[in-house]
Amino acid sequence: MLSSIKCVLVGDSAVGKTSLLVRFTSETFPEAYKPTVYENTGVDVFMDGIQISLGLWDTAGNDAFRSIRPLSYQQADVVLMCYSVANHNSFLNLKNKWISEIRSNLPCTPVLVVATQTDQREVGPHRASCINAIEGKRLAQDVRAKGYLECSALSNRGVQQVFECAVRTAVNQARRRNRRKLFSINECKIF
């Protein structure tokens, strides 16, 4: 079982990655938007009674930081690819930009697709044109993600589940990797 997990969040600017992290780690919602260049934090979580140190790496969605973003990918155990349900470009960019960047840097790391700002479906100027869950699940299948989740950092809906799923996904991936090592035959001798 992993004692520490590195979780990296990627996606376009202003899709709610930082708000999601702040809500999860401090149970507050940031009132003002502040673009992220690069930030990381950590929390201790428990899974099946075992304490795990969860490292959370918030990346810049802005293309101006494309060259330094891969530094945060090193040794990641799970990636959360985030888009806003109220921003079609952020949704399209998961397939057209983010998945290729992740796969070129982390070819074997599990990815979860996370729809953020789901409160916008109920209130807000974009509610009629918001991306629905069916479209999100289809995208997750198209990019071969391990799962699809929805959340709203503003209303604190689904936030806990996102990180529970991230931890469980990383742990399961590590177990599969260890099982393969255990059962792989490197050398065969006949006596």
Swiss-Prot record:
Cellular compartment(s): Cytoplasm; Cell membrane
Motif (Effector region): 33-41
Annotated binding of GTP, by residue: 11-18, 58-62, 116-119
Post-translational changes noted in the entry: Phosphorylated on tyrosine by LCK. Phosphorylated by FYN. Phosphorylation enhances the interactions with ZAP70 and SYK and is critical for its function in thymocyte development.
Effect of Y73F: Abolishes interaction with ZAP70
Lipidation (S-geranylgeranyl cysteine): C188
Tissue specificity field: Expression is widespread in hematopoietic cells, including in bone marrow progenitor cells and in differentiated myeloid as well as lymphoid cells. Expressed at high levels in the thymus and mast cells, found in spleen and low-density bone marrow (LDBM) cells and is detected at a low level in neutrophils. In the thymus it is detected in thymocytes of the thymic cortex but not in non-lymphoid cells of fibrovascular and fibroadipose tissues. Expressed in T-cells, B-cells and mast cells.
Modified-residue entries (Cysteine methyl ester), positions: C188
Gene Ontology cellular-component terms listed: cytoplasm; immunological synapse; plasma membrane
Keywords: Cell membrane, Cytoplasm, GTP-binding, Lipoprotein, Membrane, Methylation, Nucleotide-binding, Phosphoprotein, Prenylation
Record carries keyword Iron: no
Propeptide position ranges: 189-191
Quaternary context: Interacts with GDI1 and GDI2. Interacts with ZAP70 (via SH2 domains) and the interaction is enhanced by its phosphorylation by LCK. Interacts with SYK and the interaction is enhanced by its phosphorylation by FYN.
Name of the protein: Rho-related GTP-binding protein RhoH
UniProt source species: Mus musculus
